[in-house]
């Protein structure tokens, strides 16, 4: 893959994409799970026939490539994210998951290279979350141009456009465009396995099978180079060169208390432990306290004795 994007044209492969992470954008989240489902455009141009009365969820195409991975995030998951996704740093460590590293980035590239080009990543709310987060993870590895050969579209934007085109004069309450709401609106049921990366990808594919030919035309006209996506948050040079901790190391660090003593050779902050004084100084300080008290008592006795001598006898 070169640094230049391929010329615009019919997208040959749509890669439905979703990520779960440790939290919302303001918290600089890290990926905990990702899934990519590659579908050739011919599978959408000639969709399989649904079985049963409408609305029936269409079956996925027979020929797909899928990559699904859980990832050690290297930081704690927010309680809300853990409750929604069922993933936490401790759970991922217990299963020996690895961080988002060069190996994972190369795996993503190898997966993409197996697909007919041009490719287009399709993610729900991708412009605001999945795409910038993926760019941030790649930037941590110094690979901001790794996906310059790919294109991308946000399925929310696409589905809004398709709904407006099909019913331009429709009035009524404002519709929700969350993945679950659209799925329920189309098929009369909740999507299975919500808030798992694979479950959300399959739900998105089913939604895009609603009007596949119209979707393909919209994607061909509006896909933009993935290289135009800015990372969700800035990455410093030191962060790029700093080794990423393993899941086991991260979990052990999160579990330790703040007053745990460092091991030999480790450098802790200056606020963690008070400076160690010279043993001789400690012994001198221990002697000075009783000597000072003895001096005060001696002075008091001498004063009383002097007063007794100055007082006339009976």
Swiss-Prot record:
Record annotation: effect of changing residue 66 to R: No effect on ubiquitination
Catalytic residues, chain numbering: 195
UniProt binding sites for substrate: 20-21, 129, 200
Predominant location category: nucleus
Annotated coiled-coil segments of the chain: none
Binding site for Mg(2+) 1: 18, 20, 200
Consequence of changing residue 30 to R: Reduces ubiquitination
Region (Interaction with UBQLN1): 243-314
Similarity section: Belongs to the exonuclease superfamily. TREX family.
Known partners and oligomeric status: Homodimer. Interacts (via proline-rich region) with TCERG1/CA150 (via the second WW domain). Component of the SET complex, composed of at least ANP32A, APEX1, HMGB2, NME1, SET and TREX1. Within this complex, directly interacts with SET; this interaction does not result in TREX1 inhibition. Also interacts with NME1, but only following translocation to the nucleus. Directly interacts with UBQLN1 (via ubiquitin-like domain); the interaction may control TREX1 subcellular location.
Job of this protein: Major cellular 3'-to-5' DNA exonuclease which digests single-stranded DNA (ssDNA) and double-stranded DNA (dsDNA) with mismatched 3' termini. Prevents cell-intrinsic initiation of autoimmunity. Acts by metabolizing DNA fragments from endogenous retroelements, including L1, LTR and SINE elements. Plays a key role in degradation of DNA fragments at cytosolic micronuclei arising from genome instability: its association with the endoplasmic reticulum membrane directs TREX1 to ruptured micronuclei, leading to micronuclear DNA degradation.
Listed PANTHER family: THREE PRIME REPAIR EXONUCLEASE 1, 2, THREE-PRIME REPAIR EXONUCLEASE 1
Associated disease: Aicardi-Goutieres syndrome 1: A form of Aicardi-Goutieres syndrome, a genetically heterogeneous disease characterized by cerebral atrophy, leukoencephalopathy, intracranial calcifications, chronic cerebrospinal fluid (CSF) lymphocytosis, increased CSF alpha-interferon, and negative serologic investigations for common prenatal infection. Clinical features as thrombocytopenia, hepatosplenomegaly and elevated hepatic transaminases along with intermittent fever may erroneously suggest an infective process.
Name of the protein this chain belongs to: Three-prime repair exonuclease 1
Organism the protein comes from: Homo sapiens (Human)
């Amino acid at each position: 893959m070169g640094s230049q994007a391929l010329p615009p044209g019919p997208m040959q492969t749509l890669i439905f994409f979703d990520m779960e992470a440790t939290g919302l954008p303001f918290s600089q989240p890290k990926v905990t799970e990702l899934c990519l489902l590659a579908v050739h455009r011919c599978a959408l141009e000639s969709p399989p026939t649904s079985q049963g009365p409408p609305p029936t969820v269409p079956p996925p195409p027979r020929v797909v490539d899928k990559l699904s991975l859980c990832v050690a995030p290297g930081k704690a998951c927010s309680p809300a994210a853990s409750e929604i996704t069922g993933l936490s740093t401790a759970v991922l460590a217990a299963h020996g998951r690895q961080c988002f590293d060069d190996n994972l980035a190369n795996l993503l590239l190898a997966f993409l290279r197996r697909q007919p080009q041009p490719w287009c990543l399709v993610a729900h709310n991708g412009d605001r979350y999945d795409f910038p987060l993926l760019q941030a993870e790649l930037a941590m590895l110094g690979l901001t141009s790794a996906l310059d050969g790919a294109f991308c579209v946000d399925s929310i934007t696409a589905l809004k456009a398709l709904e407006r085109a099909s019913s331009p004069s429709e009035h009524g309450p404002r519709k929700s465009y969350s993945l679950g709401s659209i799925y329920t609106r189309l098929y009369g049921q909740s999507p299975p396995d919500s808030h798992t990366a694979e479950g959300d990808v399959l739900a998105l594919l089913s939604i895009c099978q609603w009007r596949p030919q119209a979707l393909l035309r919209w994607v061909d006209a509006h896909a933009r180079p993935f290289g135009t996506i800015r990372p969700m948050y800035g990455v410093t040079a030191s962060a790029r060169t700093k080794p990423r901790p393993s899941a086991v190391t991260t979990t052990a660090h999160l579990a330790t208390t703040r007053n745990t003593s460092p091991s030999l050779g480790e450098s802790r902050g200056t606020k963690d432990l008070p400076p160690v004084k010279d043993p001789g100084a400690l012994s001198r300080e221990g002697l000075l306290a009783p000597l000072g008290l003895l001096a005060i008592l001696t002075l008091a006795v001498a004063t009383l004795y002097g007063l007794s001598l100055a007082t006339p006898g009976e």
